[in-house]
Structure formats: C-alpha cells, structure tokens
Regions:
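Glycine-rich FAD pyrophosphate-binding loop
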Residues: 29-48
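Conserved small/polar residues in nucleotide/adenosyl-binding loops
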Residues: 252-259
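Predominantly flavin-linked oxidoreductase catalytic cores and closely associated redox partners
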Residues: 119, 123-221
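Extreme N-terminal leader/targeting segments of oxidoreductases
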Residues: 1-11
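N-terminal FAD cofactor-binding segment of flavoenzymes
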Residues: 46-86
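N-terminal Rossmann-like FAD-binding beta1-loop-alpha1 element of flavoenzymes
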Residues: 11-35
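FAD-binding beta-loop-beta segment adjacent to the flavin cofactor pocket
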Residues: 234-251
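Short beta-strand to alpha-helix junction loop
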Residues: 101-122, 203-204
Length: 269
C-alpha cells in the first residue's frame, strides 16, 4: 500500500477512555479521519464518581501546561489542586510532605459533565472525532488499542460520603488495612472517599474497608460522614516493553501514586 493511501486511511481506536480520546483528538487535529469504538454506553461509564490524582511533581513542567502545549483545555473538567498530603506511616504517625507548587490535582471519573472523561470526550468531538459507543470491534481491525486492563492484580473498594470537613488528602501505608498496597482518604467540596487497595486477601475486601473506615474515623474525628454508596474496581500492573504489536499501537496509562489504576502501565511510566 502506498504511503499516501496509509495517510488517508481512517484510523480506528479501540477504547474511549482517556488514552483513546487523547490519541484520537491529536490525530483528528492533524487532519486524520478518526473513529473511536467502546463497548460501553459512554466514556467514563465504568467509573462511579471515583476520585483520582494527577501527580505533578515528577517533572519540572506543570502537567496542565503540558496538556495545553499538546492542545488540550484543562478547564473542560473540574480539578482541585493540592500542595500537601497527610502521609500516614505503618505505625500511625502522620507527617505532611509539602510542595511550593501544585503537587497533584484531584479529578473525578465518570459520566457527569464535570468529570475528566466527559471533558476529554467534548474536546475529541470538537476536533472532529467520531465516537461509537456500544460498538464491538476486533483488535486486528484497529490501529490503536486503548481498552484498559484485561487482567487483575489488585482490587480497590471504597465508600463515598458527604461531609462538612474541608478539602483534605491522606495516603496510608498499613499492611493490616490494605494488604500489599495502601489506603487513602480524599475530600473535595463536601464529598469524601475512603478506599482500601488490596494486592493480597482480595476476597476479604469488605472486612478491610470496614476496618479502614474505622481507622480514619478514629484518627480524623471531625469527618462528619454521611455515607452515600460503596464503589469498587480492579487494577492491573505490568511492565511492558513494547508499544507496538502486530502493527498496532498499544496505549497505556501512567500511574499516580494513589491512583486506583485499572490500566496497563508502560515501563517508562
């Protein structure tokens, strides 16, 4: 096939998550015809109001400035900035690492208008991307594979609640509450999430979440929690050496230290 034919051939992407939408937007802005396929009904549909962190300390450049340089508008979704975190040690001692700039931003995942999923979706559509939901395609018919995890190496289980407590973040390393992993507390604009992540003993997630909630209520007596619902998810962590396979590009999600990852991660993350 001639190079000119390849350059004009429509690009099909499997997965309308953040990676798939970002790739589609850039390609569409470059003049390519792009079709994104997803088996779900909407971008972010596999999330349920989950909070995730976008870390901002591993590079000199601010991540939102990088987004802007890449042609994305971060004002299209809600993001709450933090410069400090409660770091809870295994012996329950709490220290507070601080940064003189934005250390990380909390975003919400899901189908609500203010989520990062919907913000990226709007920008993809504005760039001319055609998104096909409830669409099943074969990997061999796609140029880019961005469909998230297939395996499970960890599970996360949490409880969302209403609270009058001010915005706050806590990250805990305690193997008795989160075997092999970590737990965390996030509060943003009156909504909180306490979550435990399990690399081991995953069948006992209910027990570990209950014990984790009890720990936070004991050590943060002003939480003033009014439970809304419990949410769960799975995660998979692999060190991949390849970004192309059988002529198709593989997209991965770079991890945040407290991100409830459900995506495969590359070795350069």
């Amino acid at each position: 096939m001639a190079d000119s034919d390849v350059a004009t051939k429509p690009i099909h992407i499997m997965g309308a998550g953040l990676s798939g939408l970002a790739a589609a937007t850039i390609l569409a802005k470059a003049g390519r015809e792009v079709h994104v396929h997803d088996i779900r009904t909407d971008s972010g549909a596999r999330f349920d109001g989950d909070f995730q962190a976008l870390e901002n300390w591993s590079m000199d450049a601010d991540f939102f400035q990088q987004l802007n340089d890449w042609g994305f508008d971060a004002s299209q979704f809600r993001a709450t900035e933090f410069q400090v975190v409660d770091l809870i040690h295994p012996d329950d001692v709490i220290t507070q690492p601080k940064s003189d700039r934005v250390a990380y931003r909390i975003v919400e995942r899901g189908t609500a208008e203010h989520t990062i999923d919907q913000g990226m979706k709007r920008q993809a559509i504005a760039a001319g991307v055609s998104i096909h939901y409830k669409s099943r395609v074969k990997e061999e018919d796609c140029t880019i594979i961005a469909c998230g995890p297939k395996g499970t190496s960890a599970v996360a289980y949490g409880e969302i609640f209403k609270t009058s407590h001010p915005n706050h973040i806590a990250f805990q390393l305690n193997d008795k509450l989160a075997p092999g992993a970590y737990s965390y507390l996030i509060i943003v604009d009156g909504v909180g999430l306490i979550c435990t992540c399990l690399w081991r003993k995953q069948s006992k997630s209910e027990r570990f979440l209950n014990e984790t909630i009890a720990w936070y209520e004991k050590h943060y007596p002003n939480l003033d929690r009014a439970p809304i619902k419990r949410v769960g998810g799975k995660g998979d962590f692999t060190i991949n050496q390849r970004y192309k396979q059988d002529g198709r590009c593989l997209l991965y999600t770079s991890p945040s230290p407290r991100d409830r990852q459900k995506s495969r991660m590359p070795s350069s993350a």
